A protein has these predicted regions:
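Residue-level preference for long, well-ordered alpha-helices that form the structural scaffold
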Residues: 1, 5, 101-104
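Short hydrophobic helices that act as membrane-entry/anchoring signals
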Residues: 2-21, 80, 84
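Soluble catalytic domains of membrane acyltransferases
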Residues: 19-129
Length: 129
């Protein structure tokens, strides 16, 4: 049931984005040919890039991508339900340099490593934070 809801969600996202943007995706066939877990590390100069990339990659990658999302974005009230739907992981804010944030970051790294070893795929937008 969850997979059907996720497919519908990404379909609606693509439809909404199509109203404003023309997107051309090259190389999806190469992703479809991959077997096993995938770690995707795209760049995103605009805030619209993550939903655009995710909505198109969702169809291409055999295993659903689990995004890692910065905590400031993750907890935006209207985005939080979507974050839970797509099973995003929250990346803690390390700018405060707290021990709890560092521990959460280490736990997240361990979770991603275990996930990759277990066959899961992830998408991480490196931002230097």
């Amino acid at each position: 049931m969850r997979a059907v809801v996720e497919k519908m969600f990404w379909f609606v996202v693509r439809l909404i984005l199509r109203l404003r943007y023309r997107v051309r995706v090259d190389g999806l066939e190469q992703l479809r040919a991959l077997t096993g877990p995938v770690l995707v590390l795209p760049n995103h100069p605009c805030y619209i890039d993550p939903p655009t990339v995710l909505s198109h990659l969702y169809r291409a990658v055999q295993v659903p991508l689990r995004p890692l999302v910065y905590s400031g974005t993750y907890h935006v009230p209207f985005l939080l339900p979507m974050m839970k739907l797509i099973r995003a992981f929250e990346v803690p804010d390390l700018s405060a340099q707290s021990q709890s944030a560092a521990a959460q970051a280490q736990q997240l790294i361990d979770t991603v490593v275990e996930g990759i070893e277990g066959g899961n795929s992830f998408i991480i937008y490196p931002s230097g934070r």
